[in-house]
Amino acid sequence: MNNSWWQELMRFFLQGMTLKQLIHMLIILIVLIIVMPVSVKEWINLHNPEILPHYWMYYILLFCVSYVLNGVVNSVYHAVTERIEASTAQRRKDREEKVVRDLFDSLTLGERAYLAFAVAANNQLKTEKGSPEAISLLKKGIITRLPSAIGYPDIDRFIIPEKYFNECYMRFAGKSDILMNELIVQDEQLKK
């Protein structure tokens, strides 16, 4: 007897299934066999065609039900996993934005003025060596130090990393004069 139609039928059902899904399907099948009442088994056997041995229709039906349940469980699993990943990514993004926002909100007036000058100078900041504001910004990671230019040993050069440049641009673009005036007023008040 030629069994190629059985092979084709099994290939149809099992194509695209991973080993994990196949194991889940077999577990579902075993659970269905254990849980299904005997009366259902007998009722299905009454409708069993004569060409099939006893209870084959019952087991074929359970196989199909376990196949469908496995597909449903797999789809739900993937939907929930995608939802969790999207939620985790959104929470991570919100947390990173909050850290950046808190970092920029904690800047002093002098540090904000330095960043405004860097934005105005197309992301290049030159300060005299040892500037407290530049050192503070460097410690916070908002600016990175470039090697000193040849012939200018008393000048430190910095740039704003791309990670923070957009935030700096949104906060300080066009505000270097305003911040400089505020800094002058603050210095005058400190001298009094």
Curated annotation (Swiss-Prot):
- According to UniProt, the name of this protein is Superinfection exclusion protein B
Q: What InterPro entries does the annotation carry?
A: SieB
Entry function: Has a role in the prevention of superinfection by phages that are insensitive to repression.
Q: Does the keyword Manganese apply?
A: no
Cell compartments where the protein resides: Host membrane
Organism, by scientific name, is Salmonella phage P22
Segments crossing the lipid bilayer: 22-42, 51-71
Q: Which domain of life is it from?
A: Viruses
Q: What is the lineage of its organism?
A: Viruses, Duplodnaviria, Heunggongvirae, Uroviricota, Caudoviricetes
* UniProt keyword Membrane, yes or no: yes
Please provide, in alphabetical order, the Gene Ontology terms of the cellular component aspect for this entry.
host cell membrane; membrane
Name of a matching Pfam family: SieB
Look up and give the membrane topology term: Multi-pass membrane protein
Q: Which UniProt keywords apply?
A: Host membrane, Membrane, Transmembrane, Transmembrane helix
